[in-house]
């Protein structure tokens, strides 16, 4: 799973791990979650091609050993990253999620498609359109103007821009997924969704 994921897993309590293990084995008695089961658990049906690609990309980034399954430790690492991951850890994961073709760079098309897919799944109605958000990201952090973002450009640029970090974190808030895991697959109503503390990844009161 790598050092990044190990650090977040170590921060989990035994109670949390036990609860997640019970839930995981209830939903997936075989101990290995397939991509199809991953979609099924979250009630993701009739997805657009872009949304379907996003979910498959998310699954692949959490399938750390690339065997086509998510086992319990990968499941824990994924959830701990969402709940307790530090900003840089989350940004590295976001980058992997955006880099659909795996070439080590994010282009405008990749970012735009992922943002559209996330908003469709999260049922977001942000004031800023996906196109405007994508333009803002590239205008602010594509330092060399080549139309692609390297990992270094992405992490350094986002961390230096408080507004961009806030918008990015809000756009990629995955706490609704954790809510569904903890509440037997029920979707979180928009009014229930927690505001995120940008610097720590925790919810604000």
UniProtKB/Swiss-Prot annotation:
<dbReference type="GO" id="GO:0008048">
    <property type="term" value="F:calcium sensitive guanylate cyclase activator activity"/>
</dbReference>
<keyword id="KW-0844">Vision</keyword>
<feature type="binding site">
    <location>
        <position position="99"/>
    </location>
    <ligand>
        <name>Ca(2+) 2</name>
    </ligand>
</feature>
<dbReference type="InterPro" id="IPR018247">
    <property type="entry name" value="EF_Hand_1_Ca_BS"/>
</dbReference>
<feature type="binding site">
    <location>
        <position position="69"/>
    </location>
    <ligand>
        <name>Ca(2+) 1</name>
    </ligand>
</feature>
<dbReference type="Pfam" id="PF13833">
    <property type="entry name" value="EF-hand_8"/>
</dbReference>
<dbReference type="InterPro" id="IPR011992">
    <property type="entry name" value="EF-hand-dom_pair"/>
</dbReference>
<feature type="domain" description="EF-hand 2">
    <location>
        <begin position="50"/>
        <end position="85"/>
    </location>
</feature>
<keyword id="KW-0677">Repeat</keyword>
<feature type="binding site">
    <location>
        <position position="67"/>
    </location>
    <ligand>
        <name>Ca(2+) 1</name>
    </ligand>
</feature>
<keyword id="KW-0519">Myristate</keyword>
<feature type="binding site">
    <location>
        <position position="101"/>
    </location>
    <ligand>
        <name>Ca(2+) 2</name>
    </ligand>
</feature>
<keyword id="KW-0449">Lipoprotein</keyword>
<feature type="binding site">
    <location>
        <position position="110"/>
    </location>
    <ligand>
        <name>Ca(2+) 2</name>
    </ligand>
</feature>
<feature type="lipid moiety-binding region" description="N-myristoyl glycine">
    <location>
        <position position="2"/>
    </location>
</feature>
<feature type="binding site">
    <location>
        <position position="63"/>
    </location>
    <ligand>
        <name>Ca(2+) 1</name>
    </ligand>
</feature>
<keyword id="KW-0106">Calcium</keyword>
<keyword id="KW-0479">Metal-binding</keyword>
<comment type="function">
    <text>Regulatory protein that inhibits guanylyl cyclase when free calcium ions concentration is elevated. This Ca(2+)-sensitive regulation of retinal guanylyl cyclase is a key event in recovery of the dark state of rod photoreceptors following light exposure.</text>
</comment>
<feature type="binding site">
    <location>
        <position position="103"/>
    </location>
    <ligand>
        <name>Ca(2+) 2</name>
    </ligand>
</feature>
<feature type="domain" description="EF-hand 1">
    <location>
        <begin position="30"/>
        <end position="48"/>
    </location>
</feature>
<dbReference type="GO" id="GO:0005509">
    <property type="term" value="F:calcium ion binding"/>
</dbReference>
<feature type="binding site">
    <location>
        <position position="153"/>
    </location>
    <ligand>
        <name>Ca(2+) 3</name>
    </ligand>
</feature>
<feature type="binding site">
    <location>
        <position position="142"/>
    </location>
    <ligand>
        <name>Ca(2+) 3</name>
    </ligand>
</feature>
<dbReference type="GO" id="GO:0120199">
    <property type="term" value="C:cone photoreceptor outer segment"/>
</dbReference>
<dbReference type="InterPro" id="IPR028846">
    <property type="entry name" value="Recoverin"/>
</dbReference>
<feature type="binding site">
    <location>
        <position position="74"/>
    </location>
    <ligand>
        <name>Ca(2+) 1</name>
    </ligand>
</feature>
<protein>
    <recommendedName>
        <fullName>Guanylyl cyclase-activating protein 1</fullName>
    </recommendedName>
</protein>
<feature type="domain" description="EF-hand 3">
    <location>
        <begin position="86"/>
        <end position="121"/>
    </location>
</feature>
<feature type="binding site">
    <location>
        <position position="105"/>
    </location>
    <ligand>
        <name>Ca(2+) 2</name>
    </ligand>
</feature>
<feature type="binding site">
    <location>
        <position position="65"/>
    </location>
    <ligand>
        <name>Ca(2+) 1</name>
    </ligand>
</feature>
<dbReference type="Pfam" id="PF13499">
    <property type="entry name" value="EF-hand_7"/>
</dbReference>
<feature type="domain" description="EF-hand 4">
    <location>
        <begin position="129"/>
        <end position="164"/>
    </location>
</feature>
<feature type="binding site">
    <location>
        <position position="148"/>
    </location>
    <ligand>
        <name>Ca(2+) 3</name>
    </ligand>
</feature>
<feature type="binding site">
    <location>
        <position position="146"/>
    </location>
    <ligand>
        <name>Ca(2+) 3</name>
    </ligand>
</feature>
<dbReference type="InterPro" id="IPR002048">
    <property type="entry name" value="EF_hand_dom"/>
</dbReference>
<dbReference type="GO" id="GO:0001917">
    <property type="term" value="C:photoreceptor inner segment"/>
</dbReference>
<dbReference type="GO" id="GO:0007601">
    <property type="term" value="P:visual perception"/>
</dbReference>
<feature type="modified residue" description="Deamidated asparagine">
    <location>
        <position position="3"/>
    </location>
</feature>
<feature type="binding site">
    <location>
        <position position="144"/>
    </location>
    <ligand>
        <name>Ca(2+) 3</name>
    </ligand>
</feature>
<keyword id="KW-0716">Sensory transduction</keyword>
């Amino acid at each position: 799973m790598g050092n990044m994921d190990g650090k977040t897993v170590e921060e989990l309590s035994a109670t949390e791990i036990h609860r997640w293990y019970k839930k995981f084995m209830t939903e997936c008695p075989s101990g290995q979650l397939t991509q199809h089961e991953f979609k099924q658990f979250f009630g993701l049906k009739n997805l657009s091609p872009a949304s379907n690609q996003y979910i498959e990309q998310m699954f692949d980034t959490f399938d750390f050993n690339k065997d086509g399954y998510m086992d319990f430790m990968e499941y824990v690492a994924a959830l701990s990253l969402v709940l307790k991951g530090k900003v840089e850890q989350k940004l590295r994961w976001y980058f992997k999620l955006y880099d659909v073709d795996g070439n080590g760079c994010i282009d405008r098309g990749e970012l735009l498609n992922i943002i559209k897919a996330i908003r469709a799944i999260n049922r977001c109605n942000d004031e800023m359109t996906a196109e405007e958000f994508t333009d803002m990201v590239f205008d602010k952090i594509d330092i060399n103007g080549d139309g692609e973002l390297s990992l270094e450009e992405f992490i350094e640029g986002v961390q230096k821009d408080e507004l961009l970090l806030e918008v990015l974190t809000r756009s990629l808030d995955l706490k609704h997924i954790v809510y569904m895991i903890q509440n037997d697959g029920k979707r979180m109503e928009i009014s229930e969704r927690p505001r995120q503390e940008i610097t720590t990844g925790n919810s604000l009161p």
